[in-house]
Amino acid sequence: MTNIRKSHPLIKIINHSFIDLPAPSNISSWWNFGSLLGICLILQILTGLFLAMHYTSDTTTAFSSVTHICRDVNYGWIIRYLHANGASMFFICLFIHVGRGLYYGSYTFLETWNIGIILLLTVMATAFMGYVLPWGQMSFWGATVITNLLSAIPYIGTTLVEWIWGGFSVDKATLTRFFAFHFILPFIITALVIVHLLFLHETGSNNPSGIPSDMDKIPFHPYYTIKDILGLLLLILLLLTLVLFSPDLLGDPDNYTPANPLSTPPHIKPEWYFLFAYAILRSIPNKLGGVLALILSILILALIPTLHTSKQRSMMFRPLSQCVFWLLVADLLTLTWIGGQPVEHPYMIIGQLASILYFSLILIFMPLASTIENNLLKW
């Protein structure tokens, strides 16, 4: 009798993807974040489903329905905070996952990389719409400011904004459609994740050295399942510490005030994971220019495979490129800090310099460092 794991049409697919999958023998802990992202997605879908059972997407009752979840629903508070802080964990894992792809040259798997960029954009859109749902002050004004950016598009801008709003301002129609999209998008993300994995398993995983590892593969289970479980336990520890000790650490106090279109908060800012892009947007005094810079700050990832000039795939043996990479990480942290600061001196000039540096590092210094390293190889 053949093993059901290898003969059953459905179980066979799971077996080839997670059990008997040949994996490089030397992949480090930086490769844990793919599985952690999968866990985060499952957590977000499950907690989101339970929240949706009690949430009402109406401007008059949305805020009080979230309060009701926290006060009256059994363990509603923990579900709500797991969902809110789970999004933060999701983005931490996402940024590390993208950073690892950059560092070790995983972007040479073009299809996997491009699907990954689409996934990043979709997750960002989902998180933005989710932030609007509690209908607090920052929810309302965040939605107003960010959707209003589309009015910078020549000719069709204003019509487009009113079409998204479903009226002449952010109101009931906007909240209802954002809830609908926020509910459906995670399932679209799940489908994209499957495509992402499909393309990855066509080529096999990259590894820290960046050289082909076909001659030295080990089965995914038990080696990497155990390794991933360790990463998962650390993620759960971090998430539960955040949820149980300081659930509002990463939130905004303004969101505990019900939305009021007549009162603008002193500092409108998005969640922490969007602050780097928000800082780039604010650093350009022109509206359309700012919007373009905002979009390019993410889409520039699609250019990275084209800008790869090195003869080596990974940065493991390229100290100059490593310096540029860590400068980029420091620059992104600076942008994140600046995005949360008020628009005044000296933050404005720091933000502008950090934005110029961000694009310069990717477009100029990374290819330049690679070219210098190529020439050094000849010596």
Swiss-Prot record:
Residues annotated to bind a ubiquinone: H201
Of the GO CC terms on this record, one is: respiratory chain complex III
Organism of derivation? Equus grevyi
Output one GO BP term. mitochondrial electron transport, ubiquinol to cytochrome c
- Please describe the quaternary structure of this protein: The cytochrome bc1 complex contains 11 subunits: 3 respiratory subunits (MT-CYB, CYC1 and UQCRFS1), 2 core proteins (UQCRC1 and UQCRC2) and 6 low-molecular weight proteins (UQCRH/QCR6, UQCRB/QCR7, UQCRQ/QCR8, UQCR10/QCR9, UQCR11/QCR10 and a cleavage product of UQCRFS1). This cytochrome bc1 complex then forms a dimer.
Q: Where primarily located?
A: mitochondrion
Report the co-factor binding details.
Binds 2 heme b groups non-covalently.
UniProt name for this protein:
Cytochrome b
Q: What is the annotated localization of this protein?
A: Mitochondrion inner membrane
Q: Which SUPFAM superfamilies match?
A: a domain/subunit of cytochrome bc1 complex (Ubiquinol-cytochrome c reductase), Transmembrane di-heme cytochromes
Q: Name one GO molecular function term.
A: ubiquinol-cytochrome-c reductase activity
